[in-house]
Amino acid sequence: MAEASVDASTLPVTVKKKKSLSIEEKIDIINAVESGKKKAEIAAEYGIKKNSLSSIMKNKDKVLEAFESLRFDPKRKRLRTAFYTDLEEALMRWYRIAQCLNVPVNGPMLRLKANDFAQKLGHNDFKCSNGWLDRFKSRYGLVFRAQPVEATGVPVDPSTVWYQNVLPYYLNDYHPKNVFNIKETGLLYRMLPTNTFAFKGETCSVGKLCKDRITLVVGTNMDGSEKLPLLVIGKKRTPHCFKGLKSLPVCYEANRMAWMTSDVFEQWMRKLDEEFQAQQRRVVIFVESFPAHPEVKNLKSIELAFFPSCLSSKCIAMKQGVIKSLKIKYRHCLIKKFLSSVEGSKEFTFSLLDAVDTLHLCWRAVTPETIVKSYEEAGFKSQKGESDITNAEKDTGLDLVADALGAGVEFPEGLSIEEYAALDDDLETCEAAPNGDSICTKESKSDETGFYTSDEEDDDGSPGTELPLPSKSEAITALDTLKKFLRSQDMNDGLQNSLADLENFINSLSPK
């Protein structure tokens, strides 16, 4: 009997549905493969094809990153990211901090915060709709539950919470080379040891002291591999000693009080942001919560992290040892310059330009070891590997004090070089509501300050008689003298190359 022919087109088509795995299951698969289990057995166990397993292993880094950073709910099956990535990261960071502080968060509060972050980040077209909020909660696995009654009465130490929960969140997101801290400090840039006890603890000195004060802003990264250019804030935009200069080794700003202001801070942050953008880097900069440190909108490469006001200065890395090291080195140089004047029977003068050059020199000399130790003492423990640096630099000031005493510099009895360097640590450095008595006033000529300066000096410490800028031929002659001196010493290749660079630069200039 003939068999009836069957038309294949009439048969029902069975399509096997592709199995979707959650991120959690993909993590289990990755662990199984790396433990040595056969891929065929793993594929059979999870009901997937071998090429699907290969695809999971190919995207292993993305899966692990999403799982470890809690950017997605582990039960989710796809790693579809959001359009407003920076907004979502900021919102999730805020949510995690609220959780740490036992602050109950609900939908309306999250919507309000999302709109607030959108405005600060420059997303003017963003509106937090119910649909967007639902998708956001789904992406991150957020479920709002009523807070247990007993939890509301538990006392929380904000400082402990910040160290245990908030700081590690940042350190997990950023490599130590991209974690920065900045800090202001006041400096009486011409203060020699004479009569220094009269100035200890002053917050806004008067008269000549006020005139001779500047604010420094120092900043480094966490692993000590990078120091931000010093920001120096003086009183005059173009002091006498800067006349004719087109460049300085530091960033320089000026205002009446020589303080950090919100405008100066924002301008500086935007300048740094451009530099980090050019390097294609993302960094976090920790700053104190001051009116002079506003939130700066639309930064592309910098995330500003503000220390809670409840934290003490011990959490500020720059305060632990970096500023101390810089000031000790600076005081060393200042006294040495004075000693040189005494030995040469010359009147000692020290201008703001001298201070800027000296600060740049000393800033370069602050070691990575000192920086790393300062961060560790401030509680910054790297989540990406422990530091192997145990000892910071040690400044030896005993010989310097002895030399200074021998040359006639009066060190008050018991005053160490460290104490001398720290005498201006309490100077105000940021804009605030000033007390009328602390505003700088004019000092009479009869006031004694212990400064070795003459009455002919300008406010910036430079001599009243203007000296002409050297010509190109004079610069070449000076360089020849410098080369002869250096080549009589044991000079390395780096200095030889630097001399060649200097000569090429001078020769490239048009004659004046």
UniProtKB/Swiss-Prot annotation:
Ranges where the DDE-1 domain occurs: 174-375
Segments of this protein annotated with the region Disordered: 434-472
InterPro entries, per the entry: CenT-Element_Derived (IPR050863), DDE_SF_endonuclease_dom (IPR004875), Homeodomain-like_sf (IPR009057), HTH_CenpB_DNA-bd_dom (IPR006600), HTH_Psq (IPR007889)
DNA-binding region: 39-59, 108-139
Any one cellular-component term (Gene Ontology): nucleus
UniProt-listed Pfam families: CENP-B_N, DDE_1, HTH_Tnp_Tc5
Keywords per UniProt: DNA-binding, Nucleus
Record domain HTH CENPB-type: where: 75-146
Family indicated by similarity: Belongs to the tigger transposable element derived protein family.
Descriptive protein name: Tigger transposable element-derived protein 4
Name of the gene: TIGD4
